[in-house]
Structure formats: C-alpha cells, structure tokens
C-alpha cells in the first residue's frame, strides 16, 4: 500500500480528531482504515453519523458477492415499515450504508472495478424494486388492484436505461427509468374503480418522490424520466401497446441508441418481461446490416462535443475526447449495425460486448484490449472521484487534496504520473473512435491562395501592396481594409491570448483574409453591403469575442466549411454577424452544411428540443435556462441561413419561427410545472382529469403563425380548476394559487437574463382586463369576460388567437368560447366605426408621419391595414357563416372570404400578395437590422391596392 502524501496526512489528522469526539472506540487505527477515511468525505460523514457501521465493517468486511444479500438485508428493515416517511428513511440509510461498504472495498482494491459496478447497479435495482413493491401494495389497499379485462392483476414494470440497464452504474448517479404496464383495464377490490393508467401514474409519482426527494437523510437516487416516449410532455406510464406504437411510428435513432442498454428491473414478472423484450427488440436491432447508424452516432457525438464547449467543460473523463462516452459509442455502433443478425451482440453490458466484438473480429484484439483497459481505468477514476463527496461529476479536480486522493486511489506516485497514464489511455480510445466513426469536419490542407495573405496579417502592407494581392479591389476599399486590420491587430494586443491562441490566429487570419478579399463581389456596394470592408467589419467582432477562447479559433481554422459559412452569413446579414459575435457557441451549428441549409420538419422542433435538454440535469435550473436560449439561437441561425439562401419562402420562415416558439413554450411550461410540483405537489383535481388543467393562448403573430425574427410573444394563461382544491404535496397550497405561481414562474423563465440573453419578450396585456386583470384566468371567467366586458378591439385580437399549449378539454372549451364570441351578431355600422377608430389610434402612435417614408407595418396601406380588414370581415360575417372563424392567420382568412363569396377572388389574392411580400421584406429588413420604414415609393402598387380595399370595407 502506498504511503499517504502530505495533503492526505493532514486530512487524516482532521478526521481522527472528529472520531475522538464521538467517545466511542471506533478510531481508525489500522493503516488501511486511515487511508480510506482520508480519501472520502462521504464515508467519514456517514461513519460519524453511524459509528456502528465501522464496527460492522471490522466484524464483517465487505465482499465481492455480498450483493446477493442486498434484497434480504433490505426486506428485514422494511418488515416493520408502516408509512411512506419511514420507508423513505429506511431506503436512504440503507443506500448510504451499502455505498460506504462499496467505497471501502473500492479503495482497498478488495474487489475489481467490474465487481464495483455490479454492486452499485444491484444496490440501485434492489432499492427501486423494494420501493415499487411496497408502494404497489399500499396503492392496492387504497385503490384496488389493477387488472386487465380478464381480471388478471397487472404489475408495474420498470425499465432501467443507460448504465443502470447495463449493470455499470457509477457511484453517484442519476437513474433513467421508463414505467410500463402490460394491459389497460380497471382496479378491482378498492373503494372505487380507477383505470389502470391513473393507478400506475399515481404509483409512479409516489415512487419518484420516495426515491428522489431530498430529506434529512439525503436521497436515494435522482430520478430522470425524460427518456420515456415524448419526454416530459408525455404520460408518465405506458401500456405495452402504447409503447410499441410509439417506437414503431415515432422512434428516433437516438432512442434506438438509448434502448440498447434497456433492462427490465427485478426478477419477478418474467413472462411479462420477456413479452416486453420481444416487443422492443425489432426497434432496437434491425434484421439487416444498418450502416446508417454511424452517421446518427456521429451526430450525437457532435452534440456532446458542442455541449462540452458550451458548458466550458474541461478535463471531463466522460464526455471529453477518448472518454467513457466514446468507448460506449464504439461498442454500440457494432450492436446497432449488426445486432439484428448477430444475436450475441444484443447485450446491455459493455465489457462482454467488447469481447464479442473481438470474437467476431470486428475490431483487432489489441484495439479491444485498449478499449477495455481504458474503460476500466476511467470507470475506477470516475467512481473514486464521485465517492469523495457523493457528487455526480466527471471533471478532474483542481485542488491539491482531491488530486492527492485520486492519485493514491489509482495507485500512482504523483498527479503528473496519473495524468500521463490517463492521457495515454484516452488517446488510444480517441484513435479507435476516429478510425471507426470518423469526424465530419473538413480538414483540408492550406490552399496556396492563402499564403500571400500572411504578409497582409503579419506585416504593415501599403495600399499598393494589397492591390497587388487582390487586383480587383479599388483604392478606397483597399485603404479601408488596411485600417480595419490595423485596428483589429491593436485590439488583439490588448487581449489575454496565449502562445497557442496566437499561433492559431496567425494561421487563421491569412485564410480568412484570402477568402474575403478574393470574393467576386469585393467592390459591390449593393443593398446588402457585401463589399469586403463591410464583411470584415462584421466578422472582426466575432474574432475579438473568441480570440482568448482558442477552442473556437481552432474550430474555424480546422473546418473550411465553418470559415466559409461565417463569411457567407456575415456578408448576408449583420443580425447574424452580431448573434455569432455575442454567442460564439453558434459556430458549432456551422459545422454541417447539410444540417444548416436543410429545413427541419415543422413537427420536429419539439423532439429536437427534447433531445437537447436531455443532456442537462433536470435540477440544474441555470443550465436549463441557458440550454433553452442556446437552442433558440441555434435554430434562429438555421432558419435565417435558409431564408437568406432562398431555401425557405416567407410563409415557411414564419411557420418555422412559430413552431420553434411553440416547442419552447411547451418546454418552459413543463419545466416550470416540474419545479412547482416538486415544491407544492400538483392540484388534486388532476387525478380526475387528463392534462395539467392549464393552457397557453397565443395571440397576434404567434396566434396567426406569422412570427418574425424579433417578434415577442403575446400570451394569455387559462386554467381549469374548481374552487377549494388544494395541491397534494407536503407544502400544500390552494390550487388556484399554484396556477398563479406557475404563470409567474413561466414569465420568469422567459424573461430571466442569462449570458445568452432573454428567451423571448412576453406580453400578457391581452388577458382579460389587461394589466389590471389576473395573470391567469379560469376558463369560465375568460368566457364571461369575452361575452360581457371585452371591447371590440379585444374581439379583433381573438380572431388571431389559438391555443399553443394545453390539454384537449381546455382546447375544446377555448375553441367553443372563441367560436361563440366571434360569431356574435354585430351592428355593421358601429363595428366599422370601432375598428376604424382603433386603427386611427394605432397610426397616431406608431406611424412614420414622414411624407418621404412608408412604415410597412404601421402606415396606411401597410400590414396593419390588411390585418384590420381581415379581422373586420370575420367579426362582420361570422354570424352568418360560422366557418369563417376556422383559421387565425390572415392568408387563410382571405381564402375563406373568397371561397364564401364575401370578397372578390382578385381582391383576396391582391391583399394576400401584398401581405406576403411586405412580410418578406420585413424579415429581410430585420436580418439587415433595419427598421420597418422604407422609401415612400416602395410597394406603391400594393399600398394603393390595400387603400382601395380599406375604403371599400372600412371607409367612412
């Protein structure tokens, strides 16, 4: 055994003093006891709280196979448990006691790393199943036993995902679970009938609480349910049929990847378990050899590498190059490609899978040995690191004490020696990973055209010398370029940039200058300002923002694609240039041109966001806020790139911006709901209805599927909850108070300013009674307000309103209220007068009031006039034809007016053309960071057409 280093001896002294204060004869006497207690604060704290555990360890030292007794030991403790609070205490204390024994064995090398992983996994499984079974019996006593149509009792099956499923759990870990039951039906033998979905949902909620909730005894495991179908927005539990339907119809590649390690917890219910495995197998393992998964895994790896950069992670042995995740990817690429034919590859555990890969000669024996050795080395290091404080971390420490702990625990003389071996192991893994899965980046060699531009960056060239390099530049442009470079060089000199960063910048700048100066439009002074000096002025702020962050400089240097896209997009839009400068993490989005310029399916935004958020711990609110903002910025960049290149027409641009906003709204509501439910429980009436009893109504451009790049969100919050309902948590509050706080929380999540800015500006002034009204209205109060108190302009706003989040019951109620309100018969002359007065008021406040300018949005003949015409027509004629209220967007409203012969087809087409062309121009003005004001001569034909329609329908 290695001697203890100075930091460990100092730590041991502090620990020994604490043990003396216990007045029990449990001082660490033996050398191995002293070593162990100097390694882990978690072990020390638990033995101080339970000194009898140390006595027990001395009498019955931990053994490799003692996990076989976990169930028996725990059942003895649970025999006298009669309430949920006692259950939680017993589970937590048992968990901590066994973890102390595992940490003890691990430090002494008395069990192998594989045996450690097995013990950690079996401990988790034992605790999960024991908690489930205790709660199942209690729920059956309260609500009856869930049965299928044949009267057969139905169990709750729990699928363990990730390392839990593979039997490779780490010391301090989340557990990823999916809850499943075989068949639908109702409970039998209870005080009242309850359908199986409701029973198992309640059981699942109790189980999560019992395992996850922090108490004075700590927690059992942090439970993550986001890998289930539909993630947080989906049901908590699924029947076999519902699960099968989801994976057959909607299962994604990343879900196949996750399912490789899926394992059903517990040894009971074997028949149902085998049925479930048989059902999932075709989704996970394809019958044919499936090479498409390589690209999918490459994409997932790219997402992880971006996360490492975004979160500033370094020295991360899980996510870094050559880390644990890459070893898992290597094994799973063979499982997903060949597992359908080679049944022996259908294993959840990694190390046995590697041996099968070697046996099938899919990798060389030496490579498999390097992967296995690297995996065991990294997993031991990870467990030692996490056992210090029972913290889920894979980042190497920077302080001397914890480095000394890892050095001793890994059997090295010094930290430097440990790091050398770690780097060797990870480099070997990285080489195999790159060979197998590859890298998507374009690493082409330096082109000869770059070489002459080194002097432009490194030396003070004269104007004439630059013109020799780029003969097509005129003198004025050349002089401006030299000035821009000189100022940038001076600014760089004031920044903290190390030798490595300086070297990367000196290699990057000649490439960038060559590409910019040799552009064919170098002297163009067109409307897009794409001449060289303008492009450089837009790119330079980005370079200044990353000049001390070498990782991003290297990203641009090593990828021709990224450099080309930076120049192209900055040339096209100052808005994009500003976004890249403010948020350099967006550079990652430029790596894959196919991704950048290929529109995402409209219905895919929610799933993309769900995948994006899965990598962030649910309880890390700060990172969740950042992730939402980063996702939005990345998707905005993608949409803008597709807009600029003509891939997306104007109608589709707004569609994508709207669907993106809806995906984010759903994520924000669910995130806020989770935070509130954790604090207060959920409103008790939800046990009698589906959904959350909460809806978000989108007004304005969101309601009309017409969002622009800088649009805010006009939202109204509705609830469906009876009076006198309370939440069911330990800190129970009135349910309507719960919904009010939920809405306030949602507003906070949108408006909180992080390093990535605010998520959206949200305007809630369109709610009943405006700023003086309640932030959340009951559905009944909303109906009453629309019927008895709302102004005409509020009914105009309702034309463009639709539900963007909520359950079916609320959706049906809202549509009924909207339908009844808009179909109310009105006096035509009074309606015309009220609409006209509101329009005049808006023009007075928002119009340009300049004879030589035309405000596309606010001036007569512009977009607002078109919107008011559409709203007037709906309010005027819906009483006669209720089908006119079907749509909330202007284009389809005009289609309806023409279809039902209220408006002439040519007039409807003319208004639609004017509306679409003006919106298109607004999008592009936003990309150029220009206002909505243009020359009075722009859109003159459209202005005249709109004015004629206005006069016809709303003129005096």
UniProtKB/Swiss-Prot annotation:
Swiss-Prot/TrEMBL keywords: ATP-binding, Magnesium, Multifunctional enzyme, Nucleotide-binding, Nucleotidyltransferase, Transferase
A biological process term (GO) from this entry: regulation of glutamine family amino acid metabolic process
SUPFAM superfamilies, per the entry: Nucleotidyltransferase (SSF81301), Nucleotidyltransferase substrate binding subunit/domain (SSF81593)
EC assignment: 2.7.7.89, 2.7.7.42
One cellular component (GO) term of this entry: cytosol
UniProt-annotated stretches for the region Adenylyl removase: 1-441
Cofactor(s) the protein needs: Mg(2+)
One GO MF term attached to the UniProt entry: ATP binding
Catalytic activity: [glutamine synthetase]-O(4)-(5'-adenylyl)-L-tyrosine + phosphate = [glutamine synthetase]-L-tyrosine + ADP; [glutamine synthetase]-L-tyrosine + ATP = [glutamine synthetase]-O(4)-(5'-adenylyl)-L-tyrosine + diphosphate
Domain of life: Bacteria
CDD domains: NT_GlnE_GlnD_like
Protein family: Belongs to the GlnE family.
Role this protein plays: Involved in the regulation of glutamine synthetase GlnA, a key enzyme in the process to assimilate ammonia. When cellular nitrogen levels are high, the C-terminal adenylyl transferase (AT) inactivates GlnA by covalent transfer of an adenylyl group from ATP to specific tyrosine residue of GlnA, thus reducing its activity. Conversely, when nitrogen levels are low, the N-terminal adenylyl removase (AR) activates GlnA by removing the adenylyl group by phosphorolysis, increasing its activity.
Name this polypeptide is given: Bifunctional glutamine synthetase adenylyltransferase/adenylyl-removing enzyme
Organism: Photorhabdus laumondii subsp. laumondii (strain DSM 15139 / CIP 105565 / TT01)
